[in-house]
């Protein structure tokens, strides 16, 4: 008898390599706001606590709240369209998930990435494998 019935995964850096698309979206927003761009390594250090925190760390210190909000909105708009330009599943992940599903586990993704991107990426990479995919949403 299985001890657990459901396995819940994070998305970024766990199932999918998303760093390049996050970096490109960050730099697109920064460029649009005439701010200095960030390196891949910068963005790697900034991710993990949601996109608002990513942009908060990416904008120059002392950025006015309304400018931060505008930068975040630009990021979200760009990333919503470009969240899968360079993203890819880590080697072996899809096979592992299929095996877990075949063993009777319900699989889910919970992420602080925007909900629309989580659902889109889950559908692209894990359709028919992952039962539920939930991301950050307003409210």
Model-derived regions, located:
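Active-site neighborhood of HAD-like aspartate-dependent phosphohydrolases
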Residues: 1-45, 56
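Short alpha-helical
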Residues: 21, 50, 88, 95, ...
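Phosphate- and divalent-cation-binding pockets in alpha/beta enzyme and binding domains
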Residues: 25, 54, 92, 117-120
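Helix-loop "lid/cap" segments that line or gate small-molecule binding pockets
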Residues: 29-30, 50-64, 121
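Metal-dependent phosphoesterase signature
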Residues: 56-95, 103
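Substrate-recognition "cap/lid" segment bordering the active-site pocket of phosphatases
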Residues: 85-88, 114-139
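Short active-site oxyanion
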Residues: 104-108
